[in-house]
């Protein structure tokens, strides 16, 4: 099985061939290893987050690119402004990096990252419950419709269904991401089937997600409070990280290095 820490180092090295290390917040694992459903042949995929300068804010569009490694693994490179947008959209493929056990965080940014985003992650992931429901249902329906007989896609559909059931019941996000072993065994067994005998499971999932997508959860006072704390923490974190990069650049400007 692929060594995750080694993979992170390789992904980091690939990013640093294109971007300077002082702009790199970190490299974070996302995907099946976080969910406990990885297999012997599972790739390691990551997200690398960049910090823009004040000049970047004015002159450049946020970076959003993909690096494909020689072994066909992927590293998605995002400006932190785009990351915050994904957090506010409640995109679980990005939110999960707040909980992964596998990441490299630049020591220069580590304290601010942990003091803002990690410290408030349990509120960020409940920033907008309705957006989470819509995001997951949309992702699940799209995945299932791609191939209703593909075991890997149906396994992913069930994983998202279990996640949503736990999330809407207020479970801690980490528990929503990684299911109990009995469910993991079921998900892995499904995932390993290249073709299912019929579309029964797909039909059941599509019906369930279509029904859930129609729900509208009222934001009560507690939910509004969580939303506001998450909003402020993300904005403060974003500003502090950008200012930190610019302070670093000001101190080292005599190096003559170009951005």
Segments from the language model and where they lie:
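Catalytic metal-binding acidic patch
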Residues: 31-72, 157
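Acidic, carboxylate-rich catalytic segments that either coordinate divalent cations
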Residues: 230-259
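A basic- and aromatic-enriched beta-loop-alpha substructure that forms the phosphate/nucleotide-
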Residues: 57-139
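Generic structural signal for hydrophobic core residues of well-folded globular domains
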Residues: 50, 87, 161-168, 245
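Helical scaffold of the NTase/Pol beta-like nucleotidyltransferase catalytic core
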Residues: 1-28
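A generic fold-level signal
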Residues: 22, 39-41, 152
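Soluble or luminal CAZymes and related metallo-dependent hydrolases
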Residues: 3-8, 75, 79, 149, ...
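Conserved nucleotidyltransferase catalytic core and NTase-mimicking acidic/glycine-rich helix/loop elements
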Residues: 107-240
